[in-house]
Regions:
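Long beta-strand-rich cores associated with HINT superfamily self-processing modules
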Residues: 557-585
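Structural transition elements
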Residues: 369-410, 427-434
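Extracytoplasmic/peripheral linker and loop segments enriched in polar/acidic and small residues
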Residues: 50-52, 57, 359, 395-396, ...
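Surface-exposed binding/hinge segments that line
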Residues: 131, 148-150, 155-225, 250
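Gly/Pro-rich hinge or "lid" segments in bacterial periplasmic/extracellular proteins
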Residues: 101-105, 204-273, 277
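Ligand-site clamp/hinge motif
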Residues: 228-239, 262-315, 329
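N-terminal lobe/hinge region of extracytoplasmic solute-binding protein
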Residues: 67-123, 239
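Periplasmic-binding protein-like
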Residues: 339-382, 434-435, 540-549
């Protein structure tokens, strides 16, 4: 997803990410670096019906507390693209489609959610028709109408206002490049969406989009009554269709969810409503929060943390069932602005980077977070393993005196001595501060000048994601996870000129020849694409070097001793919150 598709702390640690991948059960597969990727599969069940199958041993009642060191950028469905936001909003927003986790391995299967099926594609591939379930109500008991889905889609084109949201609609939907949403003059009329009756939604495309049913699982497709749209304040009082609804939201601090009395379990093949409430507390100290969860003293037994367990806490794990593991098809990256940093300087940054020491500071586990050498992670179809010299996610970099001298001399030859590297970090986050200190020390040793800008942790995503951010290193996305099981949710949305305009760009690449190559691959059949994406992956790294792949992530999240039903959702790399319950409410 966009600069959210991966939720990474700009500081150091990637916490979670949106992904559609091959899962594993508790204590099972923890990732890897197979030579050929493809653990993800596009499994679907177009005829799935509600209610969702009961979770074994589930009980009702109580409150689950989520102690999160991450501070989400917000919870507007149009503006949501970070995986933690997607996972949390799944509790109270329903979309046209959704992923259900099947069997003991929690395999992700795409199923109808508010739609009756997974949509019908026209013969020319340019129209998708979704029949909508009848009798669905919002939290206040008012009926959901087809026009509410249409309005939500129109709203997603107001990208200057909701700049964090996904942008496939701008590329694929009819008039997507020119329509600017419902708030401008004439914005009520949009040819790309029709509602011929109150239970039918028609989406018209500018070009074929076979992955439309997968995209329809995003929160931006949650219905929204036009009369209830308060724009940037909508996240305070959104209209819920899921099992929970917002009781209160204090941005940057806390989100409280309570039961939605008008949620109809019989229509929902995915979600449950076991606990009475969820209390999300953001901006927590990661070590303190994870230790609280592991110790599980008093109310902390009812708590979880959705970041990977810091390696310093591994000796404190007494019960392996308190760690929820699984694949998360994501790559954490260190981005470099190609419009501000010359290629030869980018190569010297790569040569200087202190990979090994950074991994220690970030508390990474070599088993769950193996070093990366490619853009695509191993689980994604289209991955092929390769390693370019000095770009395998390991090494001392300019901590080595000889390397530091080489880099300094090469900078001088380029006329770039004291080249300024600038980035944001969270001034009130210990790990972020430590990582910045490490990188600053190493880069300055290698002859760079460092300008590190400290900002509050609660606002870090806002700063790193700003289109005009006055920095040249570490802009979001700081990593990426599959929007669905395909490399088409990577290269076209991250490495094209259109990605810069949409706010998703990794490295701000604007290369017409690369745009043309990617477009040509998109026009091929899915099988043919699989052979081409690995070439693009390697070409981007060899020819442009907009990013340093750091590590492939999988999930390793701590839960309190009284938490039941906790599983990793491999489509998010976060918990499947709707299956959680308290063993002793």
């Amino acid at each position: 997803m966009q600069w959210k598709r991966i939720t990474a702390v700009a500081a150091t640690v990637m916490l979670t990410a949106v992904a559609c991948g091959s899962p594993s059960s508790n204590g099972g597969n923890k990732g890897g670096t197979d030579a050929v990727g493809g653990a993800q599969v596009k499994a679907t069940d177009p005829t799935a019906k509600g209610p969702a199958a009961d979770v074994e041993g589930a009980k009702k009642g109580g409150t689950v507390t989520v102690l999160s060191d991450v501070t989400p950028s917000g919870f507007d469905p149009t503006d949501t693209y970070y995986v933690d936001g997607n996972a949390i909003e799944k509790l109270y927003f329903r979309s046209l489609t959704q992923f259900r986790l099947d069997g003991p391995d929690h395999k992700p299967v795409l199923v109808p959610d508010l739609a009756e099926d997974l949509g019908t594609k026209s013969d020319d591939g340019l129209t998708w028709t979704f029949k909508l379930k009848q009798g669905i109500k919002y939290q206040d008991g008012t009926p959901v109408k087809a026009e509410d889905y249409a309005y939500a889609i129109k709203r997603s084109f107001a990208h200057t206002l909701y700049e964090n949201g996904p942008t496939y609609q701008m590329d694929y939907f009819l008039d997507g490049k020119t329509y600017k949403g419902p708030y401008v003059n004439g914005g009520d009329v949009y040819k790309g969406v029709e509602t011929p009756d109150d239970h039918t939604l028609v989406i018209k495309l500018a070009k074929k989009f076979d992955d439309m049913p997968f995209y329809a699982a995003f929160p931006l497709f949650a219905p929204m009554p036009k009369a209830k749209d308060t724009q940037k304040n909508y996240e305070q009082h959104p209209m819920s269709t899921g099992p929970y609804m917002v009781q209160s939201y204090n941005p940057g601090s806390e989100l409280k969810l309570v039961k939605n009395p008008h949620w109809d379990a019989a229509t929902d093949p995915v979600r449950h409503q076991y606990v009475d409430a969820f209390d999300f507390k953001f901006g927590q100290d990661i070590i303190k929060a994870q230790r609280q969860v592991l110790v599980s003293s008093g109310p902390d037994a009812n708590a979880v943390n959705y970041s990977n367990l810091d390696t310093t806490l591994l000796p404190e794990v007494k019960d392996q069932s308190q760690l929820i593991t699984g694949q998360s098809p994501c790559t954490n990256m260190y981005t470099m602005d190609t419009q501000k940093i010359p290629l030869e300087v980018r190569k010297l940054i790569a040569k200087s980077y202190p990979y090994d020491s950074w991994r220690k500071v970030a508390g990474l586990n070599p088993t769950t977070d193996p070093p990366a050498s490619t853009i695509l992670p191993p689980a994604v179809p289209g991955y092929e393993k390769y390693e370019l010299p000095g770009l395998n996610g390991t090494g001392k970099g300019a901590e080595d005196d000889a390397v530091a001298k080489e880099v300094k001399d090469e900078l001088a030859k380029l006329g770039k001595s004291n080249f300024v590297l600038s980035w944001y970090y969270s001034i009130d986050d210990k790990l972020s501060t430590q990582a910045t200190q490490l990188r600053k020390q190493v880069f300055e040793k290698a002859g760079f000048t460092v300008k590190a800008i400290g900002v509050p942790k609660a606002n870090i995503r806002k700063f790193t994601g700003a289109p005009d951010a006055p920095v040249n290193i570490g802009r979001t996305p700081a990593g990426w996870c599959s929007d669905w099981p395909s490399a088409t949710s990577w290269f076209p949305v991250l490495f094209t000129t259109a990605a810069v305009e949409a706010g998703n760009s990794v490295g701000q690449l604007k290369e017409a020849s690369l745009d043309a190559e990617i477009a040509a691959i998109q026009a091929k059949t899915p099988d043919a694409q699989l052979k081409e994406w690995p070439k693009i992956d390697k070409e981007i790294m060899e020819k442009y070097l907009p990013v340093l792949p750091l590590y492939y992530s999988s999930s390793n999240m701590p839960v309190g001793k009284n938490i039941g039903g906790a599983v990793n959702d491999p489509t998010q790399g976060v918990f499947e919150f709707t299956s959680m319950f308290l063993k002793q409410p």
